[in-house]
Amino acid sequence: MMLIPKKVKFRKQHRPNRKGMSGCGTRIVFGDYGIQALSRAYVTNRQVESARIAMTRHIRRGGRVWINIYPDRPLTKKPAETRMGSGKGSPEYWVANIRPGRIMFEVSGVSESLAKEALMRAIHKLPLRARIVERQEFDDAGL
C-alpha cells in the first residue's frame, strides 16, 4: 500500500521550505507511543511503507498503528548523462517534508516494551534521527 496522491493539480512543484521547527503535528493524538523527528529530511513513500511493515510485523495482532505523515510532494530528477537546461526533470518519487518535532507514527493497544521495540524497528528504516515519546495527558490549564 504505497502512499501516492490519487490526483494532483500540477505534476511538478517547487522545493519546500525546510527551515524551522514543525508547526503542527507535534503531539501524540491517537496512540500511546510515537516517533518524533529530531532532524529534518525527506521521507519517501517507500520508507514510510517499510517502517509501517516493520512495526506491524513486530506488533502482530492486538495493536493499532497510525501514520501521521503523507508523501504529497513530487521530487523530480533528470535522466543520467543529460545536458543542462531543457526544462525540469520528470517526477521520480513522492516525499514528505519532515521537520524536527513532527510525530510521524503512533502505536497503541500493546505493552510498553513491545511498542518501544516496534517503534525502534521503524526508526531504523527512516533517514533521520528520531526518538520514542509517550503520550502526555493535558488538562485545559496545561494547554
From Swiss-Prot:
<dbReference type="GO" id="GO:0006412">
    <property type="term" value="P:translation"/>
</dbReference>
<comment type="subunit">
    <text>Part of the 50S ribosomal subunit.</text>
</comment>
<comment type="function">
    <text>Binds 23S rRNA and is also seen to make contacts with the A and possibly P site tRNAs.</text>
</comment>
<dbReference type="InterPro" id="IPR047873">
    <property type="entry name" value="Ribosomal_uL16"/>
</dbReference>
<keyword id="KW-0689">Ribosomal protein</keyword>
<dbReference type="InterPro" id="IPR016180">
    <property type="entry name" value="Ribosomal_uL16_dom"/>
</dbReference>
<dbReference type="Pfam" id="PF00252">
    <property type="entry name" value="Ribosomal_L16"/>
</dbReference>
<keyword id="KW-0820">tRNA-binding</keyword>
<protein>
    <recommendedName>
        <fullName>Large ribosomal subunit protein uL16</fullName>
    </recommendedName>
</protein>
<dbReference type="InterPro" id="IPR036920">
    <property type="entry name" value="Ribosomal_uL16_sf"/>
</dbReference>
<dbReference type="InterPro" id="IPR020798">
    <property type="entry name" value="Ribosomal_uL16_CS"/>
</dbReference>
<comment type="similarity">
    <text>Belongs to the universal ribosomal protein uL16 family.</text>
</comment>
<dbReference type="InterPro" id="IPR000114">
    <property type="entry name" value="Ribosomal_uL16_bact-type"/>
</dbReference>
<dbReference type="GO" id="GO:0003735">
    <property type="term" value="F:structural constituent of ribosome"/>
</dbReference>
<keyword id="KW-0699">rRNA-binding</keyword>
<keyword id="KW-0687">Ribonucleoprotein</keyword>
<dbReference type="GO" id="GO:0022625">
    <property type="term" value="C:cytosolic large ribosomal subunit"/>
</dbReference>
<dbReference type="GO" id="GO:0019843">
    <property type="term" value="F:rRNA binding"/>
</dbReference>
<keyword id="KW-0694">RNA-binding</keyword>
<dbReference type="GO" id="GO:0000049">
    <property type="term" value="F:tRNA binding"/>
</dbReference>
